[in-house]
From Swiss-Prot:
One annotated Gene Ontology cellular component of this protein: acetyl-CoA carboxylase complex
GO molecular function: acetyl-CoA carboxylase activity; ATP binding; carboxyl- or carbamoyltransferase activity; zinc ion binding
UniProt keyword terms in alphabetical order: ATP-binding, Cytoplasm, Fatty acid biosynthesis, Fatty acid metabolism, Lipid biosynthesis, Lipid metabolism, Metal-binding, Nucleotide-binding, Transferase, Zinc, Zinc-finger
Subunit structure: Acetyl-CoA carboxylase is a heterohexamer composed of biotin carboxyl carrier protein (AccB), biotin carboxylase (AccC) and two subunits each of ACCase subunit alpha (AccA) and ACCase subunit beta (AccD).
EC numbers for this chain: 2.1.3.15
Job of this protein: Component of the acetyl coenzyme A carboxylase (ACC) complex. Biotin carboxylase (BC) catalyzes the carboxylation of biotin on its carrier protein (BCCP) and then the CO(2) group is transferred by the transcarboxylase to acetyl-CoA to form malonyl-CoA.
Protein name: Acetyl-coenzyme A carboxylase carboxyl transferase subunit beta
Recorded family membership: Belongs to the AccD/PCCB family.
Length: 289
């Protein structure tokens, strides 16, 4: 009818078609989970995966971490071929391991080896949370223990970057015993005067936080890293108290004397270099045969 010509029409927003969305290839853009800013992935990578807007530290994989701290071309990997089995015949475990191997191109949740920082030799271990959430099973514990023993033999410092959900439940008591094994290896290294630097990244929890991650001569962490043993909700239900908002963050632990420093990723290599420089002498303050 004629009156319909004068009725105010509703305004509609144009929704991009699926074809338009597909014009932007996967991986080109990254959204920061903290400030929600969308940025070019290449810009994020150039900034060591730190958000250019809010400073949020995005997770790094093992190889990105090694590239950010070691001299170029200096890394030599240890025990690359070690892989986990399924000793307890846990249902579905082998399939999950194989899936993570394909997804990450890693054989396990930790990469160990030796390299140099400003020409100073170190043994280093880097955990990768993409593989079984960085959980510690038999192979992870064995690789870390072997790396510590190598540092002992070479009389050089040992550095570890942790990122883990804790002990691996599919391996039961075999995973829990890795807490003791790695701690004993570090004690031997320490008794000989060996330097151990632990750098805790997001997240470092469970059996990893309760063992080797907290045993450093220097305990460092990245900003905002979640560090703790049990989960926040479990603790609140146990103590029946409301915990502070920043509870179990790196900054909270620093304020309460459980960390030596919270170090921005941009400053990590230089901070490690300064510590190593202070402890020159093969990494051993007092070497005891």
């Amino acid at each position: 009818m004629l009156r319909d010509l004068f009725v105010k029409k509703k305004k509609y927003a144009a929704i991009p078609s699926e074809q338009v969305r597909k014009d932007v290839p996967d991986g080109v853009m990254t959204k920061c989970p903290e400030c929600k800013k969308i940025m070019y992935t290449k810009e994020l990578l150039k900034n060591l995966k730190v958000c250019v807007n809010c400073g949020y530290h995005h997770p790094m994989n093992a190889w990105e971490r090694l590239d950010s701290i070691l001299d170029e071309g200096s890394f030599r990997e240890y025990d690359k071929e070690m892989v986990s089995l399924n000793p307890l015949e846990f249902p579905g475990y082998e399939e999950k391991l194989e899936s993570d191997r394909k997804k990450t191109e890693l054989n396990e949740a930790v990469v160990t080896g030796e390299g140099t920082i400003d020409d100073m030799l170190v043994v280093v271990a880097v955990m990768d949370s993409r593989f079984r959430m960085g959980s510690m099973g038999s192979v992870v514990g064995e690789k870390i223990a072997r790396a510590v023993e190598k540092a002992y033999d070479l009389q050089v410092p040992f550095i570890i970057f942790t990122a883990s959900g804790g002990a691996r439940m599919q391996e039961g008591i075999l995973s829990l015993m890795q807490m003791a094994k790695t701690s004993v290896a570090l004690k031997k290294h320490s008794n000989a005067g060996g330097l151990f630097i632990s750098v805790m990244t997001h997240p470092t929890t469970g059996g990893v936080s309760a063992s080797f991650a907290s045993l450093g001569d220097y305990n460092l962490a990245e900003p905002g890293a979640l560090i703790g043993f049990a989960g926040r909700r479990v603790i609140e239900q146990t103590v029946r108290e409301k915990l502070p908002e920043d509870f179990q963050t790196a900054e909270f632990l620093l304020d309460h004397g459980q960390l030596d420093a919270v170090v921005h990723r941009d400053d990590m290599r230089e901070s490690l270099r300064k510590i190593l420089e202070v402890h020159q002498g093969g990494g051993m303050a007092v070497w005891q045969s």
